Amino acid sequence: MNLIPMVVQQDGRGERAYDIYSRLLKDRIIFLGTPIDDEVANLIIAQLLFLESEDPDKEIFFYLNTPGGHISSGMAIYDTMRYIKPPVATVCVGQAASMGALLLAAGEQGKRSALPHSRILIHQPLGGFQGQATDIDIQAREILRLKDELSLILADLTNQPLDRIKTDTERDYYMTSQQAKEYGIIDEIIVKRS
């Protein structure tokens, strides 16, 4: 069941009903509250590109509450965040796990934040393979390549040594907001909006 609240806004021309995500987009807010797959990534990318076309100099706010998801889908969002001109401020509400943690860290330096009770998780890419032995070998080499690529990106975003990233992502590595700040994934913890 997919419930999307509607909000009613009044202006000089009368009342207008918006789904909540469209209303947030008017304020340059993108909300990711699902696992990341190709469909979700395409929606996020379209919103980023739209907001850039609306005003290439005005900040975009990207709120995340996601368990992560597909690497290729997440990397498409990551690349778009880096590609567009407006700065993207990231905010974790709830959790930013796996690819979600990388997207959280990919926000504009100084504008990456989390609410106090957020949970951040980094780990190595997950993969399950089946098929012929040669195909499994190809898939295993690709997952190792992705592991190295994601480790390099995370090391760059957090200013952590690559060896530490590789060690910490060998297994699930959970962090509180405070630990994520110390790690370099976020820059601040937001208790109350100022």
UniProtKB/Swiss-Prot annotation:
It comes from the Bacteria. Cleaves peptides in various proteins in a process that requires ATP hydrolysis. Has a chymotrypsin-like activity. Plays a major role in the degradation of misfolded proteins. InterPro entries: ClpP (IPR001907), ClpP/crotonase-like_dom_sf (IPR029045), ClpP/TepA (IPR023562), ClpP_His_AS (IPR033135), ClpP_Ser_AS (IPR018215). The keyword Hydrolase applies. The active site is at S98, H123. GO terms for biological process: protein quality control for misfolded or incompletely synthesized proteins. One of its GO terms (molecular function) is ATPase binding. Keywords: Cytoplasm, Hydrolase, Protease, Serine protease. Its EC number is 3.4.21.92. This is ATP-dependent Clp protease proteolytic subunit. The lineage of its organism: Bacteria, Pseudomonadati, Thermodesulfobacteriota, Syntrophia, Syntrophales. It catalyses: Hydrolysis of proteins to small peptides in the presence of ATP and magnesium. alpha-casein is the usual test substrate. In the absence of ATP, only oligopeptides shorter than five residues are hydrolyzed (such as succinyl-Leu-Tyr-|-NHMec, and Leu-Tyr-Leu-|-Tyr-Trp, in which cleavage of the -Tyr-|-Leu- and -Tyr-|-Trp bonds also occurs). One of its GO terms (cellular component) is endopeptidase Clp complex. It is found in: Cytoplasm. Its main location: cytoplasm. Fourteen ClpP subunits assemble into 2 heptameric rings which stack back to back to give a disk-like structure with a central cavity, resembling the structure of eukaryotic proteasomes. Belongs to the peptidase S14 family. PANTHER family: ATP-DEPENDENT CLP PROTEASE PROTEOLYTIC SUBUNIT.
